[in-house]
Amino acid sequence: MKRFFSVIFLLPLLSFAQDCKLKKTKDQFSQEPKLSTGFVPFSSTTLSIDADGKEIDFLFTITNKSDERCFDDASTISFVFEGKQKSIFRNTGTMNCEGLFHVTFKNLQTTPGNLQRLITKKITAISLTGNNKSVTTITLGPQQQQELMNLITCIVNEGKTLIK
């Protein structure tokens, strides 16, 4: 009887695991396994989240040509959560004017606090501040908020399997 209830209790977790569709590849230089969400569209940007044994990399690509597309190491990204709390991170990518913005987190067995916040709180808006202090804001609707939360949760949980 206890097993029956424990199986019933775990069914929602199993149904989420089926929704977690990640692309499995190998890093072109190190040949280490790598997971990716692929590019997912959000308003005027696309997002790809990649994980390997060392880090989790968020790559935002600004697709709207009229928005500021130049970023350097002083550029920032701000995640605004429900309740108006914010998390601000610096660009970890190279200087470019192609609309590419990277945010990198360490891939650890225990999820870092900043990354944990992205998993547990719904993100209502994302603001990217470019070289000349111009801001590109991406406002997420309820469905996009849940989709983003699921993507981040999926890549973080599956990324832990790559840690050696």
Question: Where are these predicted regions, by residue range?
Answer:
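Internal interaction segment
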Residues: 85-164
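Short, surface-exposed loop motifs enriched in S/T, G, D/E and P with embedded aromatic residues
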Residues: 20-28, 33-34, 83-94, 137
